[in-house]
Amino acid sequence: MPESRAMTLAILSALPEEQHGLAALLEDTQVVARAGRRFVRGHLHGQPLVLGLTGIGKVAAATTTTTLIEHLDVQQLVFTGVAGGIGAGVQVGDVVVAQAFLQHDMDVRPLFPRWQVPGYGAAAFACDPALVQRLQQAAQACTAQAATWQDPLL
């Protein structure tokens, strides 16, 4: 029977301040440079993990994510930081775990419905439910007063 291995998780941020201190928590670290980006690979509590900075903007995030998938065998992704905005009622320091991600900054009308991603037939894309659950549990365990945001459009 083949040995199962943990999926590699990447934690990405646009800015170094949004990842402050994470690299120091990793064990067995290795710095990897690919496609003009610097990644730190290691383990956190036994979980294979890659840390990376994308720079600002969704194109920078998309190209960094592509590099992670193609060259570093990443199967799961968590983005930390503001990620483009703060929803109503959310304060700096709050933990928000998204259930979906959205196309929000390109209006393709009249060719397609508003916000729809051409070729995909959708404006919202569901996150991995198992990863969402793990992140919610971790947030609740690590924060004194964790608020749970259920608004799928945050």
Regions found by a protein language model. Give the residues of each.
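Glycine-aromatic micro-motifs
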Residues: 2-3, 65
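Short, conserved "active-site rim" segments that organize catalytic pockets and cofactor/ligand binding
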Residues: 7-26, 30, 48
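Glycine-rich phosphate- or other oxyanion-binding loops that anchor nucleotides, phosphorylated ligands
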Residues: 8-9, 33-154
